[in-house]
């Protein structure tokens, strides 16, 4: 059998798997305040970060770059507390905002969240609580006890109400860990030191106690062993039994002698204590008895942090390895474990009762039976009540208690049992029935109500039936709770709560007999019946048949209610409801035509009998509605021709509902009836529906009546949108026939849809007086030739000129071509060309004329164009062609003219004269074309000359390709002719490079020999000689010595170097020797030929320094030092001075070194040489020579020498040297020592060193040389870190004016910084306040505003203070300052701008009082600005109390759009006082939120009738009909009185008004009132009044209508009665009694 475990273990995840470094898993870096978050401080590289692990999503840790010494997460939300030093901050991570911050006076060594909004802070001396609420600061709770001195604080706990506080610490003493705790009572403000390691508080309710007790549990490990203590802290609550202290041993295994408790948590649900030790052991204890339930090791590593695990009421923790573990009670096993393994049945029972756990059923049954048998009924009842899962709360148990008779003077055992059950919780169904039966028998219904409210009873249908006999409303509550729909609805009906029936039935899904219910409701209240009927049909699927509901209304003659119901019921317009729709419309057309008209107008219904309704509409005078319903064309045509009786807009829309044929028939009928009257309307219809009716049919319709005007207007409305060519053609024809030539022009110009050929033919046939439309069409569609022919043949040459001059000059070439085709006179054509001033293509004109071989025709015009300065290539091209064809000096023209297109003219000349083609191509650099012409015509000489002159490498590469068959002929001409003729070196150079690029060395030698050796101009050309020799070295080495000997003007050094690299050493030596480059020659002898003897002989023979130097260097390399030095001296060569100086320095021979360096300086002037020479002179004490030397030109490092002299104390020499090298900083320091201040300042400026400036500045200040000090200071203040020291130096000595002058002068500096502007502003506030505002206005953005704010406030500079507050966005303070000091700080624009930005709205209201006091005339401007932020009700009240409402009338108007009651009433009051009745009427119509009746009562007494009319209007709007009618009667507004009486639906009021008209003799009003109040007047009363006043004739129309209605009603009632009699044979009527069980 598997082992039974009372606890369950779970590993949630491992921190290392989430990327957490094991080094960061520890007490100092990881915190866990609850089971929601784990927070770890990490350091990745140099970057500190905080990692937050959400336990609900641990695989997605949140990492934030936060540097903090400690971080703890809020136990409930994503709020983190951070500590850095003494600074504490709380941030909301989700909102990304800082919530609170505080700086402690002492270091916080431990802190912890003790609730969701409180952090406990522990310092070395005290404990504080810091609440997140409001702006509260940490509050000190208690001072730390001396027993915790030197302890490491590891925990802090509080009870649930934070009345008991506990601080836990540990320390190492005598080779063991000692725990120290301090328990503090908040109420008693006393502490108690306790030895302990881990502790927790618990709220535990013992059996028999009314309230839970606060228990304090703590564990300790001392030298004698471990103990767990459980005690109650504080006084027990009233009526509670005190908790008996428990102290039990805590077992530590022998192998864990150094183990001790580290954590404790309470499992509140199960009443257990979880105790964790350092070695990872879990101890589980019963909280009430202290019994140890189990002990087990759950972790091999220390669990250093724990928290309650709320989902399981267990404990969760983290160990050193990074495992996140939780432990909880195993509910399925723990009772069995306690009973069977621990052999502790009492513990099992307590656990089962406490947590309602299974496993102890037999124990409970046995105990219950034992107690019951002993007569301990109360105890047995408690056992039954507390038994888990309700195992004893059965009918048998109730019967057992019922069987026991009650003792005299005592409650029966059954009632005792029920009482205990009620104390424990809710009764079940059986218990509830039995108890209620007993209570109701005793007449104690109030107990039943109390238990129901407390939810102590399980409601059922049986319970409701039981209660209903006593209280139906109480039974309704029971039925609702028991979910018995039939009984609930029955109770609703019996109690008159009809509207709740539908809602409840829908909610619970129950379906009663709705018609039966409705008929009963209707008899009780028609209005409630209407509402009930609406609820029955408000869903998509009605709950009852609508026809049956309508029958119920008609049975009771409720026409108005029936109409209202049907409008709601039929709103979905279903086809199946057609008959109902017909009934509704017929009913209202007979009784209320205006209602029917409204219904039809809204087009709510579409499925009624339209033919029947159409007839009724016609009879009711609704002609428009009748026309909409007619379907027969004869009826429609008969009605539609009466257009003067119909709304034109409606009629146009009506045609949209007709078929195409019917629409055309109706239009035909309308035009036939009265074309003058109906033409415009027909055009509108045709325009709107032309797509449906067909444009062609409509055109034929208008043409059949010869109405071109109508056709023009119709087509004009659609032509801009139509793509039909016929439409555009017909429109053009109609426009022509109606004389609309301008419109013809427009459509011809803009339209792209007509057939141009047809339009052109029509316009030609139309013979219009203005040919412009024809011109436009021909121009647009390329009929220019036809146009010219037409115009020319019809003698309309004037329009040809108009066309080319005004319409489209660009068509001139085509026009000229056409004129040439009709053999027009050349003079006319020339004149026409000359007359055109617009832009046209010369190319096209030339092409047109050239096609016809009439090019010379253009000569005069072309020459005139050129004389006018025309530079167009086409013009010059044409002229060139004419000159070429006429042989009129064409070559001269081609060479001199700069504007023709060379490619065009060259191509023109190719077949005529290739030479001219070359001229043209050469002029335009048409390379490929020229080469092609030359090759085709064997013009190689011209081609060679062109290539040489062209100097284009790419072109050369093209012609020198191997694929060029003419390359050899071309090269011959280049060599023989082109290069011989040229005098341009660049041409030669490009040509040679081209041959080199083409890799033609033999041809290149041939070319170069021709140039260089044949005594040409370029024979002495250096580069060409170089190239010839180099080419020979590359291609033919046998010629090299010959060329070297014959030529004299080549680069010897380069040639010799190339010869060396090509192993031609003798040739190289010959070149060097020939050109006297003996040093190079001896180098060849030494390095390449390798003969030193020959080299020495050569040096003796030459006796040149360079030669000796070469020889000396070689000797030095052979260690011949003495000989080498002699050679250097003979060669006068200091080049190896480094080696010489090093050797001389080692021998310390300064005199010889001076001689060598002097020689070397004469030759080399090297810096090192001169530096060493200066130092050598200094060392040899030759000061005068030193001064002469440094004053003369030199390249020495004088600074180094000066430093060496300065270090050795030679200051005069150093001064000379520093002066020479301009080391002004060191020189200034030297001069300060010598007392030369002026020179020191000058040199400081040159040095530009802050340290030097400070030193000189302070020295000048001490000497009161303020001018020099300011000069120095300007270079110091630009360094922010130096400014404070400089200012202190000035101010300590009282030089304030000088300091201000210094800072003012410094503001213009390029490096001016914020500190300068800030400090100057502060100085102004102290010593020159009049200049401060100007300074701030200029430089506010560059000052430290908080610092200047403090200074301005201290100096009472209010205007400046406001300015700064505004710029710093502290608008509240700015407004307060302006209101506190208005004479100095208030400015209107500034105030209005700032007041809108304040955060405290209260300031807006204070501003209103401020303006009333100081600026009342500007109050409206302020109100308009503040309007979005003001409470308008408060504002109106404020000005009303101040008696200033008229002053703010503009404001009231501006905010009335908010429809605020106070604003409306205040403005209405003002308008009344001003007698502005129009404004008042507009106000009350637009804004209805005011006391209508109060205003009406005021206005009815007004002396102006207009205001009394408004009063009547208000009474009417508020259903005060009698007052409204009386006012109308008084002011003789009889029509209004009748309308108000009719709208009131008050028959008595209408009757009184009718009688009043008779009393006043208003016969016409009597008749009008009969019509207006028709449905409110009783016919018998009207008949009597008419007869008595002899007005029967006036009343006759009324009686006729009444008779008609009564006859209709009688007919309908007769039909209904017949139907009812038929139904009576089917079923007998049932009384209004509801059972709802499916039976009546």
Swiss-Prot record:
UniProt-listed Pfam families: Clathrin, Clathrin-link, Clathrin_H_link, Clathrin_propel
Region (WD40-like repeat 3): 108-149
Sequence segments annotated as region (Flexible linker): 480-523
Domain-related comment: The C-terminal third of the heavy chains forms the hub of the triskelion. This region contains the trimerization domain and the light-chain binding domain involved in the assembly of the clathrin lattice.
Modified residues annotated as N-acetylalanine in this record: 2
Chain spans, region Heavy chain arm: 524-1640
Ranges for region WD40-like repeat 7: 302-330
Membrane topology, from the record: Peripheral membrane protein
Subunit structure comment from the entry: Clathrin triskelions, composed of 3 heavy chains and 3 light chains, are the basic subunits of the clathrin coat. In the presence of light chains, hub assembly is influenced by both the pH and the concentration of calcium. May interact with OCRL. Interacts with AFTPH/aftiphilin.
Chain positions covered by the region annotation Proximal segment: 639-1640
Name of the featured protein: Clathrin heavy chain 2
Molecular function, one GO term: structural molecule activity
Annotated segments matching region WD40-like repeat 1: 24-67
Region of interest: WD40-like repeat 2: 68-107
Region (Involved in binding clathrin light chain): 1213-1522
Region (Distal segment): 524-634
Protein function: Clathrin is the major protein of the polyhedral coat of coated pits and vesicles. Two different adapter protein complexes link the clathrin lattice either to the plasma membrane or to the trans-Golgi network.
């Amino acid at each position: 059998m598997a082992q039974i475990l009372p606890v369950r273990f779970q590993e949630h995840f491992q921190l290392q798997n989430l990327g957490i470094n094991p080094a960061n898993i520890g007490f100092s870096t990881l915190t866990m305040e609850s089971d929601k978050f784990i927070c770890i401080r990490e350091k990745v590289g140099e970057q500190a970060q905080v990692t937050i692990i959400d336990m609900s999503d641990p695989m997605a840790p949140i990492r934030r770059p936060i540097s903090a010494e400690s971080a703890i997460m809020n136990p409930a939300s994503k709020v983190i507390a951070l500590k850095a030093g003494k600074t504490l901050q709380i941030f909301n991570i989700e909102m990304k905002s800082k919530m609170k911050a505080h700086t402690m006076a002492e270091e916080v060594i431990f802190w912890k969240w003790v609730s969701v909004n409180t952090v406990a802070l522990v310092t070395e001396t005290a404990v504080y609580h810091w609440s997140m609420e409001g702006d509260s600061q940490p509050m000190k709770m208690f001072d730390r006890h001396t027993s915790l001195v030197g302890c490491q604080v590891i925990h802090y706990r509080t009870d649930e109400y934070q009345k008991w506080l506990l601080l836990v610490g540990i320390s190492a003493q005598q080779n063991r860990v000692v725990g120290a705790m301090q328990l503090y009572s908040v109420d008693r403000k006393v502490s108690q030191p306790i030895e302990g390691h881990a502790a927790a508080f618990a709220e535990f309710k013992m059996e028999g106690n009314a309230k839970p007790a606060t228990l304090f549990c703590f564990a300790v490990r001392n030298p004698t062993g471990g103990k767990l203590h459980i005690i109650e802290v504080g006084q027990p609550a009233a009526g509670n039994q005190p908790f008996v202290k428990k102290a039990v041993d805590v077992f530590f295994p022998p192998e864990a002698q150094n183990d001790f408790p580290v954590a404790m948590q309470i499992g509140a649900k199960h009443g257990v204590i979880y105790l964790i030790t350092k070695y990872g052991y879990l101890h589980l204890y019963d909280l009430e008895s202290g019994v140890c339930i189990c002990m087990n090791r759950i972790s091999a590593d220390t669990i250093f942090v724990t928290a309650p695990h709320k989902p399981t009421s267990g404990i969760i923790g983290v160990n050193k390895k990074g495992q996140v573990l939780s432990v909880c009670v195993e509910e399925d096993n723990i009772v069995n474990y306690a009973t069977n393994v621990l052999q502790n049945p009492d513990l099992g029972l307590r656990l089962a009762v406490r947590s309602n756990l299974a496993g102890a059923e037999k124990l409970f049954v046995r105990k219950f039976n034992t107690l019951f048998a002993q007569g301990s009924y109360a105890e047995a009842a408690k056992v039954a009540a507390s038994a888990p899962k309700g195992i004893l709360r059965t009918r048998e148990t109730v019967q057992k208690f019922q069987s026991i008779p009650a003792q005299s003077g005592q409650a029966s055992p059954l009632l005792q049992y029920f009482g205990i059950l009620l104390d424990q919780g809710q009764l079940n169904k059986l218990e509830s029935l039995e108890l209620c039966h007993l209570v109701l028998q005793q007449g104690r219904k109030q107990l039943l109500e109390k238990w129901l409210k407390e939810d102590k009873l399980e409601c059922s249908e049986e319970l409701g039936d039981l209660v209903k006999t006593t209280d139906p409303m109480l039974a309704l509550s029971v039925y609702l709770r028991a979910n018995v729909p039939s009984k609930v609805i029955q109770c609703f009906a019996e109690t008159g709560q009809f509207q709740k029936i539908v809602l409840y039935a829908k909610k619970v899904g129950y379906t009663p007999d709705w018609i039966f219910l409705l008929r009963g409701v209707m008899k009780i209240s028609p209005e409630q019946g209407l509402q009930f009927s609406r609820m029955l049909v408000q869903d998509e699927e009605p709950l009852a048949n609508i026809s049956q509901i309508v029958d119920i209304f008609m049975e009771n003659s409720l026409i108005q209610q029936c109409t209202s119901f049907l409008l709601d019921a039929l709103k979905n317009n279903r086809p199946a409801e057609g008959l109902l729709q017909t009934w509704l419309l017929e009913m209202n057309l007979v009784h209320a035509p205006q209602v029917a008209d409204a219904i039809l107008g809204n087009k709510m219904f579409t499925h009624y009998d339209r033919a029947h309704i159409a007839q009724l509409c016609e009879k009711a005078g609704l002609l428009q509605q009748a026309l909409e319903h007619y379907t027969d064309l004869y009826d429609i045509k008969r009605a539609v021709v009466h257009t003067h009786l119909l709304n034109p807009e409606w009629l146009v829309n009506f045609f949209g509902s007709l078929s195409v044929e019917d629409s055309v028939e109706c239009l035909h009928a309308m035009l036939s009836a009265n074309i003058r009257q109906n033409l415009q309307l027909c055009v509108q219809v045709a325009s709107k529906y032309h797509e449906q009716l067909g444009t062609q049919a409509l055109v034929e319709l208008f043409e059949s009546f010869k109405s071109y005007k109508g056709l023009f207007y119709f087509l004009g409305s659609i032509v801009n949108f139509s793509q039909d060519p016929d439409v555009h053609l017909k429109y053009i024809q109609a426009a022509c026939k109606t004389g609309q030539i301008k419109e013809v022009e427009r459509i011809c110009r803009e339209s792209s849809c007509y057939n141009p050929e047809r339009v052109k033919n029509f316009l030609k046939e139309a013979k219009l007086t203005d040919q412009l439309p024809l011109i436009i069409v021909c121009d647009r569609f390329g009929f220019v030739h036809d146009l010219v022919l037409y115009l020319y043949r019809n003698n309309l040459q004037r329009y040809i000129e108009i066309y080319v001059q005004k319409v489209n000059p660009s068509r001139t070439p085509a026009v000229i071509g056409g004129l040439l085709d009709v053999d027009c006179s050349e003079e006319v054509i020339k004149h026409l060309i000359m007359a055109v001033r617009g832009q046209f293509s010369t190319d096209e004109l030339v092409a047109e004329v050239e096609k016809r071989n009439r090019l010379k025709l253009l000569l005069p015009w072309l020459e005139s164009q050129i004389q006018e300065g025309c530079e167009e290539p086409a013009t010059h091209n044409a002229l060139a062609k004419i000159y070429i064809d006429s042989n009129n000096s064409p070559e001269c023209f081609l060479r001199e003219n700069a504007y023709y297109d060379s490619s065009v003219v060259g191509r023109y000349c190719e077949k005529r004269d290739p030479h001219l083609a070359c001229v043209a191509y050469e002029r335009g650099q048409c390379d490929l074309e020229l080469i092609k012409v030359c090759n085709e015509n064997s013009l190689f000489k011209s081609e060679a000359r062109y290539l040489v002159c062209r100097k284009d490498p790419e072109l050369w590469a093209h012609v020198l390709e191997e694929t060029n068959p003419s390359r050899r002929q071309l090269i011959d001409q280049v060599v023989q002719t082109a290069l011989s003729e040229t005098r341009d070196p660049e041409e030669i150079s490009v040509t040679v490079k081209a041959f080199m690029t083409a890799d033609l060395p033999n041809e290149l030698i041939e070319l170069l020999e021709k140039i260089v050796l044949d005594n040409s101009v370029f024979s002495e050309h250096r580069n060409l000689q170089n190239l010839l020799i180099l080419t020979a070295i590359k291609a033919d080495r046998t010629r090299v010595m010959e060329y070297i000997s014959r030529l004299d003007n080549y680069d010897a050094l380069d040639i010799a170097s190339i010869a060396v690299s090509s192993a031609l050493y003798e040739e190289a030596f010959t070149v060097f020797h020939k050109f006297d480059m003996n040093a190079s020659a001896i180098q060849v002898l030494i390095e390449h030929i390798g003969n030193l003897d020959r080299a020495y002989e050569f040096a003796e023979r030459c006796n040149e320094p360079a030669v000796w130097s070469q020889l000396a260097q070689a000797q030095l390399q052979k260690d011949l030092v003495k000989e080498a030095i002699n050679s250097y001296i003979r060669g006068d060569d200091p080049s190896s001075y480094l080696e010489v100086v090093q050797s001389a320095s080692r021998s310390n021979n300064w005199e010889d070194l001076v001689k060598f360096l002097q020689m070397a300086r004469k030759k080399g002037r090297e810096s090192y040489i001169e530096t060493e020479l200066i130092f050598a002179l200094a060392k040899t004490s030759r000061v005068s020579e030193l001064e002469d030397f440094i004053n003369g030109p030199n390249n020495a490092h004088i600074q180094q020498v000066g430093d060496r002299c300065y270090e050795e104390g030679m200051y005069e020499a150093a001064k000379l040297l520093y002066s020479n090298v301009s080391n002004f900083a060191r020189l200034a320091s030297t001069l300060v020592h010598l007392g030369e201040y002026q020179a020191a300042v000058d040199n400081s400026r040159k040095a530009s060193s802050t340290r030097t400036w400070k030193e000189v500045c302070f020295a000048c200040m001490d000497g009161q040389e303020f001018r020099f000090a300011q000069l120095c200071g300007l270079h110091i203040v630009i360094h922010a870190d130096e400014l404070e020291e400089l200012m202190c130096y000035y101010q300590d000595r009282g030089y304030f004016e000088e300091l201000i002058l210094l800072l003012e002068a410094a503001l213009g500096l390029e490096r001016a910084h914020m500190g300068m502007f800030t400090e100057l502003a502060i100085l102004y506030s102290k010593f020159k306040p009049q200049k401060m505002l100007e300074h701030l206005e200029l430089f506010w953005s560059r000052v430290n505003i908080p610092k200047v704010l403090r200074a301005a406030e201290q100096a009472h500079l209010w205007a400046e203070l406001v300015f700064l507050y505004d710029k710093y966005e502290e608008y509240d303070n700015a407004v307060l300052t302006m209101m506190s000091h208005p004479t100095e700080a208030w400015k209107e624009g500034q105030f209005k701008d700032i007041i809108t930005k304040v955060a405290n709205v209260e300031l807006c209201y204070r501003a209103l009082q401020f303006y009333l006091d100081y600026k009342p005339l500007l109050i409206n401007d302020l109100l308009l600005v503040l309007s979005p932020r003001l409470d308008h009700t408060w504002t109106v009240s404020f000005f009303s109390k101040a008696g200033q409402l008229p002053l703010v009338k503009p404001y009231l108007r501006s905010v009335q759009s908010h429809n605020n009651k106070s604003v409306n009433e205040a403005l209405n009051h003002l308008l009344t006082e001003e007698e502005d009745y129009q404004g008042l009427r507009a106000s009350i119509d637009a804004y209805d939120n005011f006391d209508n009746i109060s205003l009406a009562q005021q206005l009815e007494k007004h002396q102006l009738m207009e205001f009394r009319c408004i009063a009547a209007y208000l009474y009417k709007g508020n259903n005060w009909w009698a007052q409204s009618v009386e006012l109308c009667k008084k002011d003789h507004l009889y029509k209004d009185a009748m309308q108000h009486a009719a709208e009131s639906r008050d028959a008595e009021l209408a009757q009184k008004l009718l009688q009043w008209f008779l009393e006043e003799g208003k016969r016409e009003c009597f008749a009008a009132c009969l019509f207006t109040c028709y449905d409110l007047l009783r016919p018998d009363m009207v008949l009597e009044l008419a007869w008595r006043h002899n007005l029967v004739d006036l009343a006759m129309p009324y009686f006729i209508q009444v008779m008609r209605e009564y006859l209709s009603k009688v007919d309908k009632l007769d039909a209904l009665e017949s139907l009812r009699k038929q139904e009576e044979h089917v079923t007998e009527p049932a009384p209004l009694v509801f059972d709802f069980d499916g039976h009546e």
